């Protein structure tokens, strides 16, 4: 059978595994802000393990370090800075609403 006649066969692509985000020399500590800040979203939330590509043990240690840094006020609990500009309000074309009795 020709290869052109096999439409559902997947082509083999080279797969390159990503490097882990935490190296073997990195210490997971509440004082290591450059490491901790990589695992926090823009809103100040702890990113999930799937997003971080961490092992279960690393994620637990990162979570504990982030919580300790928050308690010691090295990190904010929330990041409430406005990231967007509010668009101008569009005026209504209809009159004021009246209540039906």
Swiss-Prot record:
Biological process, per Gene Ontology: translation
A UniProt-annotated Pfam family: Ribosomal_S18
Record carries keyword Chloroplast: yes
Any Gene Ontology CC annotation: mitochondrial small ribosomal subunit
Chain intervals for the UniProt region annotation (Disordered): 1-26
Location in the cell: Plastid, Chloroplast
Entry keyword RNA-binding: yes
Cross-referenced InterPro entries: Ribosomal_bS18, Ribosomal_bS18_CS, Ribosomal_bS18_sf
Biased composition (Basic residues): 1-19
Molecular-function annotations in GO: small ribosomal subunit rRNA binding; structural constituent of ribosome
Keywords recorded for this protein, A-Z: Chloroplast, Plastid, Ribonucleoprotein, Ribosomal protein, RNA-binding, rRNA-binding
HAMAP family from the UniProt entry: Ribosomal_bS18
Subunit comment: Part of the 30S ribosomal subunit.
Family stated for the protein in its record: Belongs to the bacterial ribosomal protein bS18 family.
Name under which the protein is recorded: Small ribosomal subunit protein bS18c
Species of the source: Dioscorea elephantipes
Gene: rps18
